[in-house]
């Protein structure tokens, strides 16, 4: 759901930074 999308986006950002 939306929560999963937010969590996934957070993981992507963490991986980039």
From Swiss-Prot:
GO CC term, one of those recorded: extracellular region
Modified sites of kind Valine amide: 17
UniProt name for this protein: Caerulein precursor fragment-related peptide BM4
Superkingdom of this protein's organism: Eukaryota
Principal location listed in the UniProt entry: secreted
Tissue: Expressed by the skin glands.
Record keywords: Amidation, Secreted
Cellular localization per UniProt: Secreted
